[in-house]
Amino acid sequence: MLNADLKQQLKQLLELMEGNVEFVASLGSDEKSKELKELLTEISDMSPRLSLSEKSLKRTPSFSVNRPGEETGVTFAGIPLGHEFNSLVLAILQVSGRAPKEKQSIIDQIKNLEGSFHFETFISLTCQKCPDVVQALNLMSVINPNITHSMIDGAVFREESENIMAVPAVFLNGEEFGNGRMTIQDILSKLGSTADASEFENKEPYDVLIVGGGPASGSAAIYTARKGLRTGIVADRIGGQVNDTAGIENFITVKETTGSEFSSNLAAHIDQYDIDAMTGIRATDIEKTDEAIKVTLENGAVLESKTVIIATGAGWRKLNIPGEEQLINKGVAFCPHCDGPLFENKDVAVIGGGNSGVEAAIDLAGIVNHVTLFEFASELKADNVLQDRLRSLSNVDIKTNAKTTEVVGEDHVTGIRYEDMSTGEEHLLNLDGIFVQIGLLPNTSWLKDAVELNERGEIVIDRNNNTNVPGIFAAGDVTDQKNKQIIISMGAGANAALNAFDYIIRN
Protein backbone atom coordinates (compact mmCIF):
# COMPACT_ATOMS: atom_id res chain seq x y z
CA MET A 1 0.00 0.00 0.00
CA LEU A 2 3.05 2.24 0.36
CA ASN A 3 4.98 3.50 -2.65
CA ALA A 4 8.72 2.90 -2.98
CA ASP A 5 9.78 6.38 -1.84
CA LEU A 6 7.58 6.27 1.25
CA LYS A 7 8.79 2.78 2.14
CA GLN A 8 12.39 3.94 1.91
CA GLN A 9 11.71 6.94 4.16
CA LEU A 10 9.80 4.78 6.63
CA LYS A 11 12.57 2.19 6.75
CA GLN A 12 15.05 4.90 7.74
CA LEU A 13 12.71 6.25 10.44
CA LEU A 14 12.10 2.78 11.88
CA GLU A 15 15.84 2.50 12.50
CA LEU A 16 15.30 5.12 15.23
CA MET A 17 13.19 2.68 17.27
CA GLU A 18 14.63 1.97 20.71
CA GLY A 19 12.53 -1.06 21.66
CA ASN A 20 10.06 -3.59 20.31
CA VAL A 21 6.53 -2.61 19.27
CA GLU A 22 3.54 -4.87 18.66
CA PHE A 23 0.56 -4.08 16.44
CA VAL A 24 -2.55 -5.71 17.93
CA ALA A 25 -5.21 -5.68 15.22
CA SER A 26 -8.96 -6.29 15.27
CA LEU A 27 -9.82 -7.52 11.78
CA GLY A 28 -12.91 -8.79 10.01
CA SER A 29 -13.70 -10.08 6.53
CA ASP A 30 -14.59 -6.63 5.13
CA GLU A 31 -12.50 -4.82 2.54
CA LYS A 32 -11.18 -2.21 4.98
CA SER A 33 -9.94 -4.95 7.32
CA LYS A 34 -8.07 -6.54 4.43
CA GLU A 35 -6.49 -3.19 3.56
CA LEU A 36 -5.48 -2.60 7.18
CA LYS A 37 -3.92 -6.05 7.49
CA GLU A 38 -1.98 -5.45 4.28
CA LEU A 39 -0.67 -2.12 5.61
CA LEU A 40 0.34 -3.48 9.03
CA THR A 41 1.98 -6.54 7.49
CA GLU A 42 3.91 -4.35 5.07
CA ILE A 43 5.17 -2.12 7.90
CA SER A 44 5.93 -5.04 10.25
CA ASP A 45 8.10 -6.67 7.61
CA MET A 46 10.30 -3.57 7.49
CA SER A 47 11.81 -3.94 10.98
CA PRO A 48 12.66 -6.88 13.26
CA ARG A 49 11.45 -4.73 16.16
CA LEU A 50 7.86 -4.81 14.84
CA SER A 51 5.34 -7.65 15.13
CA LEU A 52 1.65 -8.15 14.34
CA SER A 53 -0.97 -10.13 16.24
CA GLU A 54 -4.77 -10.22 16.21
CA LYS A 55 -7.29 -9.64 18.98
CA SER A 56 -10.89 -8.43 19.17
CA LEU A 57 -11.04 -4.71 20.04
CA LYS A 58 -13.89 -2.23 20.50
CA ARG A 59 -13.93 -1.36 16.78
CA THR A 60 -13.18 -3.35 13.63
CA PRO A 61 -11.03 -2.64 11.73
CA SER A 62 -8.66 -1.11 14.27
CA PHE A 63 -5.31 -1.74 15.92
CA SER A 64 -3.37 -0.77 19.02
CA VAL A 65 0.30 0.18 19.12
CA ASN A 66 1.71 -1.62 22.18
CA ARG A 67 4.89 -2.70 23.84
CA PRO A 68 5.19 -6.49 24.16
CA GLY A 69 3.00 -7.46 27.11
CA GLU A 70 2.00 -3.85 27.83
CA GLU A 71 -0.93 -1.86 26.47
CA THR A 72 -0.11 1.80 25.86
CA GLY A 73 -3.64 3.02 25.19
CA VAL A 74 -2.82 4.18 21.63
CA THR A 75 -5.39 2.90 19.11
CA PHE A 76 -6.14 3.68 15.46
CA ALA A 77 -9.65 2.80 14.24
CA GLY A 78 -9.49 2.82 10.45
CA ILE A 79 -6.48 3.00 8.18
CA PRO A 80 -4.11 5.86 9.14
CA LEU A 81 -2.91 6.95 5.74
CA GLY A 82 -3.16 10.46 4.28
CA HIS A 83 -2.36 13.12 6.85
CA GLU A 84 -2.51 10.54 9.66
CA PHE A 85 0.37 8.40 8.42
CA ASN A 86 2.79 10.66 10.29
CA SER A 87 0.71 10.10 13.43
CA LEU A 88 1.24 6.36 13.08
CA VAL A 89 4.99 6.69 12.54
CA LEU A 90 5.34 8.98 15.57
CA ALA A 91 3.29 6.57 17.69
CA ILE A 92 5.58 3.68 16.72
CA LEU A 93 8.71 5.64 17.65
CA GLN A 94 7.31 6.97 20.92
CA VAL A 95 5.93 3.60 22.04
CA SER A 96 9.35 2.08 21.25
CA GLY A 97 10.89 4.43 23.81
CA ARG A 98 12.06 7.26 21.58
CA ALA A 99 12.04 10.47 23.63
CA PRO A 100 9.40 13.00 22.51
CA LYS A 101 10.41 16.48 21.36
CA GLU A 102 8.51 18.22 24.13
CA LYS A 103 9.68 20.45 26.95
CA GLN A 104 10.24 18.64 30.22
CA SER A 105 7.72 20.96 31.88
CA ILE A 106 5.01 19.69 29.49
CA ILE A 107 5.98 16.06 30.09
CA ASP A 108 5.79 16.66 33.84
CA GLN A 109 2.32 18.19 33.48
CA ILE A 110 1.14 15.08 31.61
CA LYS A 111 2.67 12.71 34.18
CA ASN A 112 1.02 14.59 37.04
CA LEU A 113 -2.54 14.37 35.66
CA GLU A 114 -4.73 12.44 38.08
CA GLY A 115 -7.80 10.42 37.14
CA SER A 116 -8.76 8.28 34.14
CA PHE A 117 -8.93 9.93 30.73
CA HIS A 118 -10.31 7.99 27.77
CA PHE A 119 -10.09 10.18 24.65
CA GLU A 120 -11.64 9.49 21.24
CA THR A 121 -10.90 11.71 18.24
CA PHE A 122 -12.99 11.58 15.07
CA ILE A 123 -10.95 12.62 12.03
CA SER A 124 -10.93 12.63 8.26
CA LEU A 125 -7.80 11.63 6.38
CA THR A 126 -7.87 14.89 4.40
CA CYS A 127 -7.94 17.00 7.58
CA GLN A 128 -4.76 19.00 8.14
CA LYS A 129 -5.70 20.02 11.68
CA CYS A 130 -6.39 16.50 12.87
CA PRO A 131 -2.83 15.11 13.13
CA ASP A 132 -1.83 17.75 15.69
CA VAL A 133 -4.62 16.61 18.01
CA VAL A 134 -4.10 12.90 17.35
CA GLN A 135 -0.35 13.15 17.95
CA ALA A 136 -0.79 15.18 21.14
CA LEU A 137 -3.26 12.71 22.65
CA ASN A 138 -1.20 9.70 21.53
CA LEU A 139 1.84 11.16 23.28
CA MET A 140 -0.17 11.80 26.43
CA SER A 141 -1.27 8.14 26.36
CA VAL A 142 2.32 6.94 26.04
CA ILE A 143 3.50 9.13 28.94
CA ASN A 144 0.63 8.61 31.40
CA PRO A 145 -0.83 5.09 31.90
CA ASN A 146 -4.14 6.61 33.04
CA ILE A 147 -4.73 8.08 29.56
CA THR A 148 -5.95 6.23 26.47
CA HIS A 149 -6.66 7.57 23.00
CA SER A 150 -8.41 6.22 19.93
CA MET A 151 -8.23 7.90 16.53
CA ILE A 152 -11.45 7.14 14.62
CA ASP A 153 -11.75 7.66 10.86
CA GLY A 154 -15.28 8.97 10.35
CA ALA A 155 -15.33 7.70 6.76
CA VAL A 156 -14.92 4.11 8.01
CA PHE A 157 -17.16 4.34 11.07
CA ARG A 158 -20.05 6.22 9.52
CA GLU A 159 -22.72 5.30 12.05
CA GLU A 160 -20.65 6.63 14.94
CA SER A 161 -19.73 9.81 13.09
CA GLU A 162 -23.15 10.50 11.57
CA ASN A 163 -23.80 13.56 13.75
CA ILE A 164 -20.23 14.87 13.63
CA MET A 165 -19.97 17.73 11.16
CA ALA A 166 -16.52 19.13 11.94
CA VAL A 167 -13.21 17.47 12.65
CA PRO A 168 -11.21 16.89 14.67
CA ALA A 169 -13.98 16.18 17.19
CA VAL A 170 -12.61 15.05 20.55
CA PHE A 171 -14.58 13.19 23.20
CA LEU A 172 -13.39 12.53 26.75
CA ASN A 173 -14.97 9.68 28.72
CA GLY A 174 -17.91 9.73 26.30
CA GLU A 175 -18.59 13.47 26.55
CA GLU A 176 -17.76 16.16 23.98
CA PHE A 177 -14.39 17.71 24.89
CA GLY A 178 -13.45 19.98 22.00
CA ASN A 179 -13.44 20.68 18.26
CA GLY A 180 -10.77 21.95 15.94
CA ARG A 181 -7.03 22.22 16.21
CA MET A 182 -5.66 21.92 19.74
CA THR A 183 -2.07 21.88 20.89
CA ILE A 184 -0.95 19.69 23.74
CA GLN A 185 -0.90 22.82 25.90
CA ASP A 186 -4.51 23.57 24.93
CA ILE A 187 -5.56 20.08 25.98
CA LEU A 188 -3.72 20.32 29.29
CA SER A 189 -5.29 23.71 29.93
CA LYS A 190 -8.79 22.30 29.32
CA LEU A 191 -7.95 19.57 31.82
CA GLY A 192 -7.03 22.22 34.38
CA SER A 193 -3.25 21.91 34.07
CA THR A 194 -1.50 25.09 32.93
CA ALA A 195 2.11 26.07 32.38
CA ASP A 196 3.74 27.43 35.50
CA ALA A 197 4.40 31.17 35.21
CA SER A 198 7.67 30.63 37.10
CA GLU A 199 9.07 29.07 33.92
CA PHE A 200 9.16 32.60 32.45
CA GLU A 201 10.23 34.57 35.53
CA ASN A 202 13.97 34.32 35.01
CA LYS A 203 14.01 35.18 31.31
CA GLU A 204 16.27 38.11 30.51
CA PRO A 205 14.72 41.04 28.60
CA TYR A 206 14.71 40.62 24.83
CA ASP A 207 15.93 42.99 22.16
CA VAL A 208 13.00 41.92 19.98
CA LEU A 209 9.96 39.97 21.14
CA ILE A 210 7.65 38.75 18.37
CA VAL A 211 4.04 37.92 19.21
CA GLY A 212 2.58 35.39 16.77
CA GLY A 213 3.91 32.37 14.92
CA GLY A 214 3.01 32.71 11.24
CA PRO A 215 5.06 33.64 8.17
CA ALA A 216 5.55 37.28 9.25
CA SER A 217 6.71 36.17 12.69
CA GLY A 218 9.13 33.55 11.40
CA SER A 219 10.64 35.93 8.88
CA ALA A 220 11.04 38.69 11.49
CA ALA A 221 12.63 36.32 14.01
CA ILE A 222 15.20 34.98 11.56
CA TYR A 223 16.15 38.48 10.41
CA THR A 224 16.61 39.84 13.95
CA ALA A 225 18.50 36.74 15.10
CA ARG A 226 20.86 37.12 12.15
CA LYS A 227 21.51 40.68 13.33
CA GLY A 228 22.69 39.29 16.65
CA LEU A 229 19.67 40.54 18.58
CA ARG A 230 18.24 38.57 21.50
CA THR A 231 15.01 37.34 19.93
CA GLY A 232 11.94 35.67 21.38
CA ILE A 233 8.69 34.38 19.89
CA VAL A 234 5.43 33.98 21.80
CA ALA A 235 2.96 31.93 19.76
CA ASP A 236 0.15 29.45 19.98
CA ARG A 237 1.79 27.47 17.16
CA ILE A 238 4.49 27.98 14.56
CA GLY A 239 2.92 28.44 11.12
CA GLY A 240 -0.23 30.14 12.36
CA GLN A 241 -3.17 30.12 9.97
CA VAL A 242 -0.99 28.58 7.26
CA ASN A 243 -1.30 25.26 9.10
CA ASP A 244 -4.91 25.16 7.90
CA THR A 245 -4.04 25.80 4.23
CA ALA A 246 -4.23 22.81 1.91
CA GLY A 247 -2.13 23.62 -1.15
CA ILE A 248 0.30 26.50 -1.68
CA GLU A 249 1.29 27.09 -5.30
CA ASN A 250 2.21 30.80 -5.32
CA PHE A 251 5.22 30.86 -2.99
CA ILE A 252 7.89 31.75 -5.51
CA THR A 253 10.68 29.14 -6.06
CA VAL A 254 8.53 26.46 -4.39
CA LYS A 255 6.34 24.98 -7.11
CA GLU A 256 3.92 23.30 -4.73
CA THR A 257 3.69 22.58 -1.01
CA THR A 258 1.11 22.19 1.74
CA GLY A 259 0.40 24.37 4.74
CA SER A 260 1.60 21.67 7.12
CA GLU A 261 4.85 21.18 5.23
CA PHE A 262 5.40 24.94 4.98
CA SER A 263 4.88 25.34 8.73
CA SER A 264 7.20 22.43 9.50
CA ASN A 265 9.92 23.95 7.32
CA LEU A 266 9.40 27.34 8.98
CA ALA A 267 9.82 25.78 12.43
CA ALA A 268 12.98 23.98 11.30
CA HIS A 269 14.41 27.23 9.91
CA ILE A 270 13.68 29.06 13.18
CA ASP A 271 15.40 26.25 15.10
CA GLN A 272 18.62 26.91 13.21
CA TYR A 273 19.03 30.21 15.06
CA ASP A 274 19.32 31.27 18.69
CA ILE A 275 15.64 32.16 18.96
CA ASP A 276 13.66 31.57 22.16
CA ALA A 277 10.45 30.14 20.67
CA MET A 278 7.76 29.87 23.36
CA THR A 279 4.83 27.99 21.82
CA GLY A 280 1.49 26.89 23.19
CA ILE A 281 1.05 30.20 24.99
CA ARG A 282 -0.80 33.40 24.05
CA ALA A 283 -0.26 37.06 24.88
CA THR A 284 -3.11 38.85 26.64
CA ASP A 285 -1.78 42.40 27.05
CA ILE A 286 0.99 44.77 25.98
CA GLU A 287 2.17 47.96 27.66
CA LYS A 288 5.01 50.37 27.00
CA THR A 289 6.70 51.77 30.10
CA ASP A 290 9.75 53.98 30.56
CA GLU A 291 11.92 50.91 31.16
CA ALA A 292 10.66 48.44 28.54
CA ILE A 293 7.74 47.12 26.54
CA LYS A 294 5.96 44.53 28.68
CA VAL A 295 3.95 41.64 27.24
CA THR A 296 1.65 39.74 29.61
CA LEU A 297 0.94 36.07 28.88
CA GLU A 298 -2.22 34.12 29.59
CA ASN A 299 -0.58 32.39 32.56
CA GLY A 300 0.20 35.74 34.19
CA ALA A 301 3.89 35.82 33.30
CA VAL A 302 5.32 39.11 32.00
CA LEU A 303 8.08 39.32 29.39
CA GLU A 304 10.11 42.47 28.74
CA SER A 305 11.69 43.66 25.51
CA LYS A 306 13.24 46.75 23.93
CA THR A 307 10.97 46.30 20.90
CA VAL A 308 7.95 44.18 20.02
CA ILE A 309 6.73 43.01 16.61
CA ILE A 310 3.04 42.06 16.60
CA ALA A 311 2.37 39.36 14.01
CA THR A 312 -0.68 37.58 15.38
CA GLY A 313 -2.30 37.12 11.97
CA ALA A 314 -5.99 36.61 11.41
CA GLY A 315 -8.73 33.99 11.82
CA TRP A 316 -11.86 33.10 9.89
CA ARG A 317 -14.38 35.91 9.53
CA LYS A 318 -17.92 34.93 10.46
CA LEU A 319 -21.22 35.90 8.82
CA ASN A 320 -22.65 37.24 12.10
CA ILE A 321 -26.20 36.27 11.20
CA PRO A 322 -28.82 34.49 13.36
CA GLY A 323 -28.18 30.77 13.78
CA GLU A 324 -24.52 30.81 12.76
CA GLU A 325 -22.81 30.84 16.16
CA GLN A 326 -24.89 28.07 17.73
CA LEU A 327 -24.47 25.80 14.69
CA ILE A 328 -20.70 26.11 14.28
CA ASN A 329 -19.35 22.53 14.08
CA LYS A 330 -22.95 21.38 13.62
CA GLY A 331 -23.09 22.10 9.90
CA VAL A 332 -21.44 25.52 9.82
CA ALA A 333 -17.79 24.99 8.90
CA PHE A 334 -14.77 26.98 7.76
CA CYS A 335 -12.36 24.33 6.44
CA PRO A 336 -13.54 22.44 3.33
CA HIS A 337 -10.46 20.21 3.30
CA CYS A 338 -11.04 19.07 6.88
CA ASP A 339 -14.80 18.85 7.04
CA GLY A 340 -15.78 18.31 3.39
CA PRO A 341 -15.68 14.48 3.56
CA LEU A 342 -18.27 14.57 6.37
CA PHE A 343 -20.80 15.93 3.86
CA GLU A 344 -20.35 13.25 1.21
CA ASN A 345 -23.44 13.01 -1.03
CA LYS A 346 -25.13 15.88 0.83
CA ASP A 347 -26.11 19.40 -0.25
CA VAL A 348 -23.96 22.31 0.96
CA ALA A 349 -23.48 26.03 0.45
CA VAL A 350 -20.28 28.04 0.18
CA ILE A 351 -20.48 31.68 1.21
CA GLY A 352 -17.98 33.91 -0.58
CA GLY A 353 -17.04 34.45 -4.20
CA GLY A 354 -13.34 35.21 -3.80
CA ASN A 355 -10.52 32.78 -4.53
CA SER A 356 -11.00 30.91 -1.25
CA GLY A 357 -14.74 30.50 -1.75
CA VAL A 358 -14.50 29.37 -5.36
CA GLU A 359 -11.65 26.96 -4.56
CA ALA A 360 -13.75 25.54 -1.72
CA ALA A 361 -16.75 25.08 -4.02
CA ILE A 362 -14.59 23.31 -6.61
CA ASP A 363 -13.11 20.95 -4.01
CA LEU A 364 -16.47 20.21 -2.41
CA ALA A 365 -18.13 19.53 -5.76
CA GLY A 366 -16.05 16.36 -6.03
CA ILE A 367 -17.35 15.09 -2.68
CA VAL A 368 -20.87 16.33 -2.01
CA ASN A 369 -24.10 15.96 -3.97
CA HIS A 370 -24.57 19.65 -4.77
CA VAL A 371 -22.90 23.00 -4.02
CA THR A 372 -24.58 26.41 -4.05
CA LEU A 373 -22.14 29.32 -3.97
CA PHE A 374 -23.42 32.65 -2.60
CA GLU A 375 -21.77 36.00 -3.40
CA PHE A 376 -22.98 39.31 -1.97
CA ALA A 377 -21.70 41.36 -4.93
CA SER A 378 -23.04 41.31 -8.48
CA GLU A 379 -20.16 39.17 -9.73
CA LEU A 380 -17.57 36.75 -8.38
CA LYS A 381 -14.20 38.18 -7.33
CA ALA A 382 -12.12 35.04 -7.87
CA ASP A 383 -9.47 34.69 -10.58
CA ASN A 384 -10.95 33.97 -14.00
CA VAL A 385 -9.24 30.59 -14.25
CA LEU A 386 -11.02 29.50 -11.06
CA GLN A 387 -14.36 30.88 -12.22
CA ASP A 388 -14.08 28.99 -15.50
CA ARG A 389 -13.36 25.76 -13.64
CA LEU A 390 -16.30 26.35 -11.29
CA ARG A 391 -18.76 27.03 -14.10
CA SER A 392 -17.74 23.81 -15.83
CA LEU A 393 -19.05 21.72 -12.93
CA SER A 394 -22.55 20.27 -13.33
CA ASN A 395 -23.42 20.08 -9.62
CA VAL A 396 -22.74 23.73 -8.75
CA ASP A 397 -25.13 26.69 -8.74
CA ILE A 398 -23.92 30.30 -8.38
CA LYS A 399 -26.07 32.99 -6.78
CA THR A 400 -24.81 36.58 -6.94
CA ASN A 401 -26.49 39.62 -5.37
CA ALA A 402 -27.31 37.21 -2.55
CA LYS A 403 -27.38 38.39 1.06
CA THR A 404 -27.43 35.52 3.55
CA THR A 405 -29.74 36.37 6.45
CA GLU A 406 -30.12 33.28 8.67
CA VAL A 407 -28.67 29.83 9.27
CA VAL A 408 -31.62 27.51 9.84
CA GLY A 409 -31.60 24.50 12.16
CA GLU A 410 -32.02 23.32 15.74
CA ASP A 411 -29.26 20.86 16.65
CA HIS A 412 -27.77 20.84 13.12
CA VAL A 413 -27.99 22.88 9.92
CA THR A 414 -31.08 22.24 7.80
CA GLY A 415 -31.03 25.30 5.53
CA ILE A 416 -30.07 28.89 4.87
CA ARG A 417 -32.20 31.97 4.24
CA TYR A 418 -31.02 34.60 1.79
CA GLU A 419 -32.29 37.73 0.09
CA ASP A 420 -32.05 38.24 -3.66
CA MET A 421 -30.97 41.87 -3.59
CA SER A 422 -31.92 42.42 -7.23
CA THR A 423 -35.59 41.65 -6.48
CA GLY A 424 -35.84 41.98 -2.69
CA GLU A 425 -37.31 38.48 -2.44
CA GLU A 426 -36.38 36.16 0.43
CA HIS A 427 -35.67 32.48 -0.15
CA LEU A 428 -35.03 29.37 1.95
CA LEU A 429 -32.62 26.78 0.60
CA ASN A 430 -32.66 23.39 2.31
CA LEU A 431 -29.21 21.90 2.77
CA ASP A 432 -26.93 20.07 5.22
CA GLY A 433 -23.81 22.21 5.51
CA ILE A 434 -22.51 25.76 5.10
CA PHE A 435 -18.85 26.60 4.45
CA VAL A 436 -18.04 30.23 5.27
CA GLN A 437 -15.25 31.71 3.12
CA ILE A 438 -15.60 35.50 3.46
CA GLY A 439 -12.10 36.46 4.45
CA LEU A 440 -10.20 36.89 7.67
CA LEU A 441 -10.62 38.76 10.95
CA PRO A 442 -7.41 40.19 12.50
CA ASN A 443 -6.38 38.75 15.87
CA THR A 444 -6.25 42.07 17.72
CA SER A 445 -8.85 41.77 20.49
CA TRP A 446 -6.08 41.19 23.04
CA LEU A 447 -4.49 44.56 22.22
CA LYS A 448 -7.39 46.59 23.61
CA ASP A 449 -6.25 50.25 23.18
CA ALA A 450 -2.51 49.56 23.14
CA VAL A 451 -2.01 50.57 19.48
CA GLU A 452 -4.12 52.27 16.83
CA LEU A 453 -6.57 50.03 14.96
CA ASN A 454 -8.70 50.86 11.92
CA GLU A 455 -12.44 50.24 11.59
CA ARG A 456 -11.78 46.61 10.57
CA GLY A 457 -9.73 45.96 13.69
CA GLU A 458 -6.43 45.89 11.78
CA ILE A 459 -3.29 47.49 13.19
CA VAL A 460 -2.48 50.75 11.41
CA ILE A 461 1.16 50.83 10.25
CA ASP A 462 3.39 53.04 8.13
CA ARG A 463 5.78 51.99 5.36
CA ASN A 464 8.36 50.94 7.98
CA ASN A 465 5.85 48.76 9.87
CA ASN A 466 5.76 51.20 12.78
CA THR A 467 2.58 51.40 14.83
CA ASN A 468 1.62 54.67 16.53
CA VAL A 469 3.65 53.55 19.58
CA PRO A 470 7.45 53.90 19.18
CA GLY A 471 9.19 50.55 19.54
CA ILE A 472 6.07 48.53 18.73
CA PHE A 473 5.96 47.25 15.15
CA ALA A 474 3.44 45.04 13.35
CA ALA A 475 3.54 42.82 10.27
CA GLY A 476 1.41 40.43 8.26
CA ASP A 477 -2.33 39.80 8.10
CA VAL A 478 -2.92 41.52 11.46
CA THR A 479 -2.10 44.88 9.85
CA ASP A 480 -3.87 47.16 7.40
CA GLN A 481 -1.67 46.08 4.48
CA LYS A 482 -4.02 45.65 1.54
CA ASN A 483 -3.03 42.25 0.21
CA LYS A 484 -2.97 39.21 2.48
CA GLN A 485 -0.54 36.67 1.07
CA ILE A 486 2.10 34.42 2.64
CA ILE A 487 4.91 35.89 0.58
CA ILE A 488 3.83 39.46 1.37
CA SER A 489 3.64 38.68 5.08
CA MET A 490 7.15 37.27 5.04
CA GLY A 491 8.44 40.41 3.37
CA ALA A 492 6.59 42.53 5.91
CA GLY A 493 8.14 40.54 8.75
CA ALA A 494 11.61 41.15 7.36
CA ASN A 495 10.85 44.85 6.95
CA ALA A 496 9.60 45.11 10.53
CA ALA A 497 12.70 43.29 11.77
CA LEU A 498 15.12 45.60 9.97
CA ASN A 499 13.30 48.66 11.26
CA ALA A 500 13.26 47.26 14.80
CA PHE A 501 17.02 46.83 14.51
CA ASP A 502 17.35 50.41 13.31
CA TYR A 503 15.17 51.60 16.23
CA ILE A 504 17.38 49.80 18.75
CA ILE A 505 20.66 51.23 17.48
CA ARG A 506 19.18 54.75 17.44
CA ASN A 507 17.67 54.50 20.92
UniProtKB/Swiss-Prot annotation:
Q: Which SUPFAM superfamilies match?
A: FAD/NAD(P)-binding domain (SSF51905), Thioredoxin-like (SSF52833)
UniProt keyword terms in alphabetical order = Disulfide bond, FAD, Flavoprotein, NAD, NADP, Oxidoreductase, Redox-active center
Please name the Pfam families in this protein's record.
Answer: Pyr_redox_2, Thioredoxin_3
Instruction: Quote the EC number.
Output: 1.8.1.-
Give the co-factor note: Binds 1 FAD per subunit.
Could you say which cofactors this protein requires? FAD
Q: Which Gene3D superfamilies match?
A: 3.40.30.80, FAD/NAD(P)-binding domain
List residues binding NAD(+).
347-361
Cysteine pairs bridged by disulfides in the record: 335-338
**List of residues binding FAD:** 207-222, 467-477
A biological process (GO) of this protein is: response to reactive oxygen species
| InterPro entries in alphabetical order | AhpF_NTD_C, AhpF_NTD_N, Alkyl_hydroperoxide_Rdtase_suF, FAD/NAD-bd_sf, FAD/NAD-binding_dom, Ferredoxin-NADP_redctase_2, Pyr_nucl-diS_OxRdtase_2_AS, Thioredoxin-like_fold
Give the Gene Ontology MF terms in alphabetical order. flavin adenine dinucleotide binding; NAD binding; NADH-dependent peroxiredoxin activity; oxidoreductase activity, acting on a sulfur group of donors, NAD(P) as acceptor
What's this chain's function? Answer: Serves to protect the cell against DNA damage by alkyl hydroperoxides. It can use either NADH or NADPH as electron donor for direct reduction of redox dyes or of alkyl hydroperoxides when combined with the AhpC protein.
Subunit organization: Homodimer.
PANTHER family, A to Z: THIOREDOXIN REDUCTASE 1-RELATED-RELATED
What remark does the entry add?
A: The active site is a redox-active disulfide bond.
Under NCBIfam families, the record lists: AhpF (TIGR03140)
Protein family: Belongs to the class-II pyridine nucleotide-disulfide oxidoreductase family.
**Name of the protein this chain belongs to:** Alkyl hydroperoxide reductase subunit F
